[in-house]
Every structure is written in structure tokens, then in C-alpha cells.
């Protein structure tokens, strides 16, 4: 099968047809959402997957809530018009905290969001100190503070918001080395603590991609917790019980919002995850 880059107007050679499978969209502002997709694919390998990333507005962490809601709804709408969806996963903590109500109101298929894994982290911590590593947007939003009040009110929560770590994760996917010195600088507030967090919530879907490097920088024995496996289980349940019969026999496909050199350079990465085709998605608005 040939590798394919499409600008949204050029027809491409489809992969060898297969049996129709439920179509699931995984969406993120960048390509960090592949960490969630990988967990879902591990549990549910026989689905028709679409991965969409918004390389025009990336990163979302610094955008307004109104902008994010409008943008995410427009992108999911554009995908749904191309491929009827059985389910959509918003594999972006920032987008999930603000856009899920609008998505669920507009669409009949289930929409799964990603929220920081504060509840399991509160159960796992031994010293009662939990770190939340996320974008600044996620750290600031009331939804995050409500999760903490509900599930971790007996824990000491230390929050760090970083847009730079998102960029480091994207760079790693492009094949660049991750600077441990940069991570140490970002994590300095924790590393200087007399008793730092023993459990760290990776509150951005980009951050599991940096797990290896984080474990080299954080104190030995630190647990890293993310939502990927829980999202996969939730996806499986919803597909069985609530999803519409929306299937496709097409090959998995990835969509970007602009066919830039940076997007084109991601094709080998996307191919490793099972997406042979990268195409520009036309989005209104």
C-alpha cells in the first residue's frame, strides 16, 4: 500500500477493503492524543479509526473557552459529514473540560472526554501528596478544581501548568531528543520540595509520550497516572450499549487542518500507529 498525503481535493487510492467496522474518531489539538488512541486500539483492535488533529489552532491550552468549543464542534461536524461516527473521543484534556456539553447536545453518538486521573491518583498516593501536571488551561479551569474537591479533598494537590511540555512531546514524535534539563526546569517546584508528590497525574494526553523522560527526572518510585486505559474501557462499553450502527470498511485515516511541512513530517509517526493516509480536512468557520 502506497503512502498517501492528500490535500482534501485529490482522490486517493483506498486500502484493500475489509469488513465494515464501527467508526471511532479520536481528536486532539495535536498528536498527543495518539497515547489515548493506542490504549483504545490495544483493547479494541478491530475498529475503523479516524485520528484528527488541529494543527492550525494548536495548542489549545492558551485559547479561550469559547474559541475551543466552536472549533471542536466544527471539526467533529466536518468529520461526521465525511464518515458517520459510532463514537468520538476528545483526547484532549483542555478541550474535554469545556466542549463536551456542546458536543453531546449536537450529536446523537456517544462522546467520550478525557479528564485528569485525580480519583485513582488519590487512591494510590502513599504520602498524600499528588502532583497534577497539565496545561495552564486545565490547571486553571473550575472543572479541575471540582474534581479535586470531589475525589482528593484529603490530599495535598500540587499543580504545575506547562505549555512547553506539550511542545516537547510533539518534538519527540518528530524524532527529536527530549531535553532532561528542560524537564528539570519545568518540574523544579516539585524537585525542590522537602517531600515531593509520590504520585503524578499526567493531565494532558501529550504527557504519557514523555513518561520515560519524566521517570528519569522525578524522584525514584514516583507513580505516573493517566486516563488512557479507563477511556479505552469506557469506549468499549459505549460501543456495545449505546453507539449507533455507523460502520466503514475503509482503511484508518488521519486528518490535519492544514497540510504544512510539519504535518507531512508526521506521516511516518501516524503510519506506525496504523494510519496510512493523512488528509487535510475542510472545516467551516
Residue ranges and their predicted role:
Residues 2-285:
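Non-catalytic structural scaffold of enzyme domains
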Amino acid at each position: 500500500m502506497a503512502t498517501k498525503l492528500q490535500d482534501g481535493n485529490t482522490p486517493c487510492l483506498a486500502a484493500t477493503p475489509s469488513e465494515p467496522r464501527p467508526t471511532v474518531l479520536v481528536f486532539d489539538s495535536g498528536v498527543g492524543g495518539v497515547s489515548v488512541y493506542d490504549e483504545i486500539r490495544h483493547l479494541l483492535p478491530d475498529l475503523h479509526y479516524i485520528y484528527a488533529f488541529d494543527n492550525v489552532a494548536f495548542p489549545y491550552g492558551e485559547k479561550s473557552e469559547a474559541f475551543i468549543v466552536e472549533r471542536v464542534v466544527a471539526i467533529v461536524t466536518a468529520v461526521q459529514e465525511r464518515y458517520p461516527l459510532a463514537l468520538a473521543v476528545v483526547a484532549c484534556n483542555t478541550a474535554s473540560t469545556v466542549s463536551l456539553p456542546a458536543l453531546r447536545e449536537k450529536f446523537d453518538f456517544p462522546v467520550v472526554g478525557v479528564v485528569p486521573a485525580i480519583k485513582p491518583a488519590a487512591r494510590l498516593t502513599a504520602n498524600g501528596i499528588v502532583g497534577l501536571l497539565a496545561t495552564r488551561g486545565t490547571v486553571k479551569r473550575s472543572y479541575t478544581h471540582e474534581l479535586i474537591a470531589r475525589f482528593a479533598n484529603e490530599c495535598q494537590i500540587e499543580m504545575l501548568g506547562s505549555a512547553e511540555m506539550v511542545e516537547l512531546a510533539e518534538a519527540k514524535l518528530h524524532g527529536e531528543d527530549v531535553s532532561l534539563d528542560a524537564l528539570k526546569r519545568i518540574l523544579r517546584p516539585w524537585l525542590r520540595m522537602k517531600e515531593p508528590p509520590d504520585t503524578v497525574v499526567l493531565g494532558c494526553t501529550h504527557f504519557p509520550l514523555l513518561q520515560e523522560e519524566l521517570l528519569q527526572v522525578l524522584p525514584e518510585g514516583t507513580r505516573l497516572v493517566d486516563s488512557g486505559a479507563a477511556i479505552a474501557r469506557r469506549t468499549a462499553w459505549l460501543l456495545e450499549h449505546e453507539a449507533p450502527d455507523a460502520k466503514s470498511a475503509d482503511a484508518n485515516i488521519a486528518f490535519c487542518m492544514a497540510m504544512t511541512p510539519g504535518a507531512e513530517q508526521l506521516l511516518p509517526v501516524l503510519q506506525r500507529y496504523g494510519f496510512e493516509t493523512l488528509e487535510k480536512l475542510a472545516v467551516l468557520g
